[in-house]
Design a protein with these regions (language model features):
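Rieske [2Fe-2S] iron-sulfur-binding domain
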Residues: 48-168
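C-terminal catalytic domain of Rieske-type non-heme iron oxygenases
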Residues: 80, 143-401
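Generic structural signal for secondary-structure transition and capping sites
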Residues: 36-40, 87, 200
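Non-catalytic accessory segments flanking enzyme active sites
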Residues: 17, 21-60, 65
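Short, contiguous pre-domain boundary segments
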Residues: 5-21, 172
Length: 401
């Protein structure tokens, strides 16, 4: 711990992290416990489980969670661990069940997680004490958030401040049209750092940069001028202008972090498509296509990117200390029909090609970080969110000392 404290204290402000933060297994284990086991994570959307008994699994490292809709219509989350000898109860990634039965010894639980059958169990044992372990769960406008902590930080401020912009995009009435998992041979922090900056967007993402004004420095005249058409048409399109920042070093004490910001698309683009033209029916309260894109932060590693006709969700997670993954979800209006209202390949094109490019970038970054010649370098002014992420990350580690 003394070595970690020294490492944190030696870290130069607004410079990239020391190599040990990306390679040390002990630091990685601390990160898992302090950050991933204590943060709210986007697990999915309630449209995935519309009927009683519908469930899907959310897996992270050694943990598996059953997210299930009960007979009462409520959505609950249980740890996928039988209270007998620990076997996984659900083996399929999704399905519909009348009861949850462990495949090992047939211990059986109802949809509320109560143990209802355990053959040959002593009558001295009270089944009420052997319910499935709960996992903390919250719904925000249809989005399912989970937290592995027994005492999670509050998510109430996130709900209060993000409900209005989420309703604007009709989040509750969306469905997942596509889900892709991207493996990344790099430390999870390099993946999150990359997502949090657009310094690389112009040189590395020509498909994105030709349509999204975030490639500019947000303090530049070019960026300011690009915002005017988007802002001038917000009201006409049934939208409102919000700007919410309670993320990373602006996180409110005892609350999960969150943020919302909207920025413009360039002329000729009204959504995140290859040709700038609509991809799907309008969503939420939006009455016409507004030439912009909105970023949501839902905790430290879950993000949304919202256009007038679809929403893209990103969730970053570690696999090992030197590998990670990114789950990407494309969401459209719940009534939209594939092949008629939207073409799946056109829908996913931009963020599929961009994420694949990011994977290459991040892996190359990790290869350089592995070198004996790697040393920290200064962030640019255009990497302000990355600076804030690093500052927040170091504070999380300090709290473990």
């Amino acid at each position: 711990m003394e070595k970690l404290e020294q490492l944190i204290n030696n870290q130069i402000k607004d410079w990239s992290l020391d190599q040990k933060f990306y390679k040390d297994k002990d630091i990685y284990n601390l990160e898992i416990e302090k950050i991933y086991m204590n943060s709210w994570l986007l697990a999915g959307h309630e449209s995935q489980i519309p009927n009683p008994g519908d469930y899907f699994l959310f897996n992270l490292l050694t943990e598996s969670v059953i997210i299930i809709r009960g007979k009462d219509g409520l959505i609950r989350a249980f740890m996928n661990v039988c209270r007998h000898r620990g076997s996984h109860v659900c083996l399929e990634s999704k399905g519909n069940v009348k009861r949850l039965m462990c495949p090992y010894h047939a211990w059986t639980y109802n949809l509320e997680g109560d143990l209802v059958a355990a053959k040959n169990l002593s009558t001295d044992i009270d089944k009420k004490n052997l319910s499935l372990h709960n996992c903390s769960i919250e719904l925000i406008e249809g989005l399912i958030m989970i937290n592995f902590s027994d005492h999670p930080k509050s998510i109430e401020m996130m709900k209060q401040e993000l409900t209005a912009p989420m309703q604007m995009f009709g989040m509750k009435d969306l469905k997942i049209a596509a889900h892709r998992n991207y493996s990344i041979d790099a430390n999870w922090k390099l993946a999150v750092e990359n997502y949090n900056e657009c310094y690389h967007c112009a040189p590395a993402h020509p498909e994105y940069a030709k349509s999204h004004s975030l490639k500019y420095d947000e303090s530049s005249k070019e960026y300011e001028l690009a915002q005017k058409p988007m802002k001038d048409t917000l009201i006409k399109c049934g939208m409102k202008d919000y700007d919410i920042a309670a993320d990373y070093d602006a996180q409110i004490e005892s609350q999960e972090q969150y943020a919302y910001h909207r920025y413009a698309l360039f002329g000729g683009y009204i959504t995140g498509s290859e040709d700038g033209q609509p991809l799907a029916p309008l969503i939420g309260d939006i009455t016409d296509y507004n030439p912009g894109a909105s970023d949501f932060n839902l905790g430290p590693v879950s993000f949304l990117l919202a256009y007038s006709d679809h929403v893209v969700a990103y969730v970053f997670s570690p696999v090992t200390h030197h590998t990670s993954q990114c789950d990407v979800y494309w969401m459209v209006d719940n009534d939209a029909k594939e092949g008629g209202d939207y073409d799946l390949e056109r829908l996913i094109w931009l963020w599929d090609v961009t994420t694949k490019a990011d994977e290459r970038i991040i892996v190359n970054n990790q290869k350089g970080v592995n070198s004996r010649k790697y040393s920290s370098g200064p962030f640019s002014e255009k990497e302000s969110t990355e600076k804030r992420f690093i500052s927040w990350y170091l504070d999380q580690l300090r709290e473990t000392l």
